[in-house]
A protein has these predicted regions:
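Alpha/beta catalytic cores of nucleotide-metabolism and tRNA/nucleoside-modifying enzymes
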Residues: 3-7, 20, 178, 350-353, ...
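Conserved alpha/beta catalytic core and glycan-binding cleft of carbohydrate-active enzymes
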Residues: 339-428
Length: 443
């Protein structure tokens, strides 16, 4: 655990403590670092700040994917906003996924819309992680202020672990190192890195993907782990390979990649490779020792492919956890029947895929429902459509735990009324909820 300056152990004691933890803590079973405890201590500074949300989130997520989840696996979906993430917590999900695709499209600090090609500003995903955690904190403050305690039936643990998209690291190993630190400072529980060339990175379901050599991808995973160790947080690291579809690579020098070279080169100087299952397996096996979960991006939802990939990874790294993108880029009914769709996540879990997520569900939910209401409102009978499509369904959802019907309270009006009352000595004539339409009409 991080130590304050006046409680700090000597360098030698810190090194010994780290070495003991790495050797004896089951958390690090099967994890390869490629650096020493002395390296971590030398480069982390004399004062080690604590990163409570990242620390807790990583520990919770690790326990969930190792048997403590409700379903035997964690299923999440990409949140497009902090408020949407809060609703996920209220509805009973156990983790939040934060998609770089969605951040690129509708949530980046560049304040514009991009495709998933690493065009947005480097700080965008950490900023969204921070924003989600700030909203979780406010929701928890509101709940706590009402006297609801952990263990109470109505208590909600808002601090869901957030798994964030680091794309291809936005550069080399130093970029990945700094990005990982930024993610941890923002409170991310898990972070994933992919093996594409950052300069021409594409969505996993686009064409034109270029792989970096296997060793370079491993070094980015080492960089991410090193950053987490320097920060003193057991962040969950997910390694993603795009080798199922990517048929280009930057170099021909890596022995792990040479079996897949075709001998052809492109006008940009890239080497052509044979994409598919075998190339994916070679990468997954190579990444497994440096990651906590391994993920192979695929073009269709294929249990057979998932099984072969899992078996190969587990033959080399027994028990290694796996992750799967249940992507909206798949035409699900074109590939599977209703029964197969219904059992798909359970079937994946049985193969060891313990963190599963729908990358773009949040933005599809948001944009689809916005369009549906806007179309009815623009072309129909005005307020009838708001009442029938939004307000009445919201009222009906209260029995499931939905509370945004009382939207003033949801965002903290009652909490700040309480703050005002305390400051003004126990009474106030300017409280926001007193005399509000919400108080009069929604209770």
């Amino acid at each position: 655990m991080p130590q304050s300056l006046n409680q700090q152990l000597s360098r030698e004691q810190q090194i010994a403590a780290l070495e003991k933890d790495w050797a004896q803590n089951p958390r690090w079973k099967g994890v390869k670092r490629g650096y020493s405890a002395a390296d971590v201590v030398r480069l982390r500074g004399s004062l080690q700040p604590e990163h409570t949300l990242a620390q807790r989130g990583a520990e919770v997520l690790w326990n969930k994917i190792n048997g403590d989840s409700k379903k035997g696996y964690v299923n999440a979906f990409g949140a497009i906003s902090a408020g949407q993430a809060m609703q996920q917590a209220k509805a009973g999900l156990e983790a939040v996924y934060l998609s770089g695709w969605q951040v690129a499209a509708d949530g980046n600090t560049s304040e514009t819309m991009y495709p998933d090609q690493s065009l947005y500003a480097y700080d965008s995903v950490p900023t969204m992680v921070r924003r989600i955690n700030n909203t979780f904190k406010r929701a928890d403050e509101i709940q706590w202020g009402k006297g609801v305690n952990p263990g109470d039936k109505e208590f909600i643990d808002y601090f869901l672990p957030i798994v964030a998209d680091a794309e291809a690291g936005f550069g080399g190993v130093l970029n990945a190192f700094e990005l990982m630190k930024n993610m941890i400072q923002a409170g991310a529980a898990g972070v994933h890195f992919e093996d594409q060339l950052a300069a021409v990175k594409k969505c996993g379901h686009m064409g034109g993907k270029v792989l970096v050599p296997t060793r370079e991808a491993c070094e980015k995973l080492i960089s991410a782990r090193f950053a987490a160790d320097v920060m003193g947080v057991p962040t969950i690291i997910l390694a993603r390979t795009d080798a199922e579809a990517a048929n280009l690579i930057t170099s021909n020098h890596d022995a792990n990649d040479q079996a897949f070279l075709t001998g052809e080169r492109t006008q940009e100087g890239f080497y052509r490779v044979k994409n598919g299952l075998e190339q994916s397996i070679s990468r997954g096996v190579a990444y497994a020792p440096y990651a906590d979960l391994v993920w192979c991006e695929t073009g269709v939802p294929d249990i057979g492919f998932a099984r072969e990939f899992a078996q190969a990874v587990h033959a080399a790294s027994p028990g290694k956890l796996l992750s799967y993108n249940c992507s909206p880029s798949f035409n699900w009914k074109k590939n599977l029947n209703d029964s197969q769709i219904a059992s798909f996540q359970e079937d994946l879990s049985a193969l060891g895929y313990k963190f599963q997520f729908i990358t773009l569900a949040g933005i599809h939910i948001n944009w689809y429902n916005s369009f549906q209401f806007a179309h009815a409102y623009a072309n129909g009978e005005g307020m009838k459509h708001y009442v029938n499509m939004v307000q009445e369904p919201e009222f009906a959802a209260r029995e499931k735990g939905y509370t945004f019907v009382s939207h003033q309270q949801e965002v903290g009006a009652g909490y700040f009324d309480d703050v005002t009352t305390v400051i003004q000595g126990g009474s106030s004539s300017v409280k926001a909820l007193t005399g509000s339409t919400e108080e009069e009409q929604f209770h």
